[in-house]
Amino acid sequence: MPTLSVFMDVPLAHKLEGSLLKTYKQDDYPNKIFLAYRVCMTNEGHPWVSLVVQKTRLQISQDPSLNYEYLPTMGLKSFIQASLALLFGKHSQAIVENRVGGVHTVGDSGAFQLGVQFLRAWHKDARIVYIISSQKELHGLVFQDMGFTVYEYSVWDPKKLCMDPDILLNVVEQIPHGCVLVMGNIIDCKLTPSGWAKLMSMIKSKQIFPFFDIPCQGLYTSDLEEDTRILQYFVSQGFEFFCSQSLSKNFGIYDEGVGMLVVVAVNNQQLLCVLSQLEGLAQALWLNPPNTGARVITSILCNPALLGEWKQSLKEVVENIMLTKEKVKEKLQLLGTPGSWGHITEQSGTHGYLGLNSQQVEYLVRKKHIYIPKNGQINFSCINANNINYITEGINEAVLLTESSEMCLPKEKKTLIGIKL
C-alpha cells in the first residue's frame, strides 16, 4: 500500500530573478556570459577579495587566543561600534547623542528579516511597503511573507536614461500616509537642496518610515562618507529609521554573511527599548550571529594601517569599474550603435543600467547567450578584456535589429508610484 506523502500537495515555487543564473548554468553555449552576479568580480572573472582581508583572515585563523565561543545574540560589540562609525562617521550627531545602535545580523537578508518582524509587531498601522525595484527580488518577498502589501517603484527614467529626482519626489508625494519606504543608495539621483527639503518635508508630514539599504559602502564613489550622504541628511533632520548595512561585498567576504540592522531613534531611551525587542526576535531567528567575518572586519576598521589598505583597495576597484564603463561606451560609439551611451559612465557603483528595452534584453539572452536581468541593470565588474568585444557587439546587434520597429523605443514604466508584487 503506497504511503501518502506529507509533501504531495506542495507545488513548485514561483521563479525569482535568481532563475536567470540557473538558466545560465544549464546553457551549453561555450561563449555564454552572465552579467548579473551580486558580487564584485575581478578582471579574471573571479569574486573580488581585498588583499588586506585575505591577510587579516589568515592572521585571525592562526591566533591561539581565540576560543571560538558563540557570540552574544546582539553580536560582537566591537564590530557593531566600528560598523556604526563607518556608516555615520565617528562624530555623527546620532552617535554623539547615543541614539543609534545596531544588531549584528546574518548579512543584509538577516537585517531585513529582523527589521520586518519588528515592524509587523510594533508598527502595526504600517502594512504597505514601497520598495525600490532593484531590491524587490531580494527583500520584497520578506515583507510580503510577513503580511505586508508590497509595491515596487523605480526612479530610473528610460527616456532620459538617468535617475530622475522628480520621479522620486513624485513617488513620495503619491504614496499613502504611514507606509514603509525602502530606499537604496540614490547617489545618482541628483536632488537639489530644495529637492532634499521637499523630500524630507513629505516623509515627515506623511509619517513615512524610511528603511535604507546600504549594501556596498565605498563601492559607489570610493568615498565612504559620500556613499552614505543620504543617511547624514536624515540624521540631521532628526528622523528615526532602520538601515540594512551589509559588509560582505565591500570587504569581499561573501561566504560569511556579515551585516547589521541599524536603528536610529529619537533618543537613547527609545533606542534601548527597540534594541531589547530586536534581541528577542534575533534570539528566535538565529540566536548567535556568525563570528569570523565580523572579527576580520573589526580588525581592519580598528587598525589605521589596515584601514588605509582597505580604502585603497576600494579606490582601485571603483577606478577599474569606471574604466570598464568608459571602454563599453567608447566601443559602442565606435560601432556606431544608435543612441546615446553617456549614461553608462554617469552611473556610480558596480551595477548600472544599459538603457536597453525588454526586446533588446531578450535578444541578448536568447540569441547571444548574454544573460542580463529584465530591467537591464548589469554588474559592470563582470565585463573584462576577454568578453567586452562580444558584449558590445551583441548590444550593437540587438539595438540595430530593433531600431526600425516601435519596440526599440523605451516605454515609460507605469511603476513610478508602484506596482503590486
UniProtKB/Swiss-Prot annotation:
<keyword id="KW-0663">Pyridoxal phosphate</keyword>
<comment type="subunit">
    <text>Homodimer.</text>
</comment>
<dbReference type="InterPro" id="IPR015421">
    <property type="entry name" value="PyrdxlP-dep_Trfase_major"/>
</dbReference>
<dbReference type="InterPro" id="IPR004839">
    <property type="entry name" value="Aminotransferase_I/II_large"/>
</dbReference>
<protein>
    <recommendedName>
        <fullName>Putative aspartate aminotransferase, cytoplasmic 2</fullName>
        <ecNumber>2.6.1.1</ecNumber>
    </recommendedName>
</protein>
<dbReference type="InterPro" id="IPR015424">
    <property type="entry name" value="PyrdxlP-dep_Trfase"/>
</dbReference>
<dbReference type="GO" id="GO:0030170">
    <property type="term" value="F:pyridoxal phosphate binding"/>
</dbReference>
<dbReference type="GO" id="GO:0004069">
    <property type="term" value="F:L-aspartate:2-oxoglutarate aminotransferase activity"/>
</dbReference>
<feature type="modified residue" description="N6-(pyridoxal phosphate)lysine">
    <location>
        <position position="249"/>
    </location>
</feature>
<dbReference type="InterPro" id="IPR015422">
    <property type="entry name" value="PyrdxlP-dep_Trfase_small"/>
</dbReference>
<keyword id="KW-0963">Cytoplasm</keyword>
<keyword id="KW-0032">Aminotransferase</keyword>
<dbReference type="Pfam" id="PF00155">
    <property type="entry name" value="Aminotran_1_2"/>
</dbReference>
<dbReference type="GO" id="GO:0005829">
    <property type="term" value="C:cytosol"/>
</dbReference>
<dbReference type="GO" id="GO:0006532">
    <property type="term" value="P:aspartate biosynthetic process"/>
</dbReference>
<keyword id="KW-0808">Transferase</keyword>
<comment type="similarity">
    <text>Belongs to the class-I pyridoxal-phosphate-dependent aminotransferase family.</text>
</comment>
<dbReference type="InterPro" id="IPR000796">
    <property type="entry name" value="Asp_trans"/>
</dbReference>
